Design a protein with these regions (language model features):
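Loop-to-helix element that buttresses phosphate recognition and phosphoryl-transfer chemistry
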Residues: 48-52
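RNase H-like nuclease fold core
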Residues: 1-47, 58-59
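Short intrinsically disordered terminal tails
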Residues: 1, 135-136
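RNase H catalytic domain
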Residues: 8-17, 54-124, 128, 133-135
Length: 136
């Protein structure tokens, strides 16, 4: 079993209107961040949050991991998958469907962490997401 532990986060800049994502791989295998372009869902940071999780899982699969632990601070990324939250908007429906597809290829465990409470892995993912959305 080869397990990845990742922290994911999303960000939205009100001044630029850009959305970003950040993914921190705890093992140092390479962090990811970027801007999400052309989103018209109006969901702002949620787009970044869900993109971060999908990109983390896709990257873990590509890197040969068999399992991934996703540490997140936005509850929707887990609760839409478990059905605790109803997927009312297209963004959450698309996220749920994509994750169910990806979860056939890799074991996924979700762990909630509190935002901005001194967790260095989460803080690092937050900084990456802000870079992606153009926040300095």
């Amino acid at each position: 079993m080869k397990e990845a532990i990742v922290y994911t986060d999303g960000s939205y800049s009100g001044s630029t209107g850009k959305m970003g994502y950040g993914v921190h791989f705890e093992d140092g295998s390479g962090d990811l961040h970027g801007e999400i372009k052309n989103d018209s869902s109006g969901s702002r940071n949620v787009v970044g949050e869900t993109a971060a999780v999908i990109i983390a899982v896709q990257t873990a699969i590509a890197r040969g991991y068999t399992d991934i632990v996703i540490r997140y601070d936005y509850e929707g990324v887990e609760k839409w998958i478990t059905g605790e939250w109803t997927c009312r908007k297209p963004i959450s429906q698309q996220y749920r469907d994509k994750m169910h597809e990806l979860m056939k290829q890799i074991g996924v465990t979700f762990e909630h962490v509190k935002a901005h409470k001194g967790n260095e892995g989460n803080n690092h993912a937050d900084r990456l997401a802000k870079q992606g959305s153009g926040i300095k």
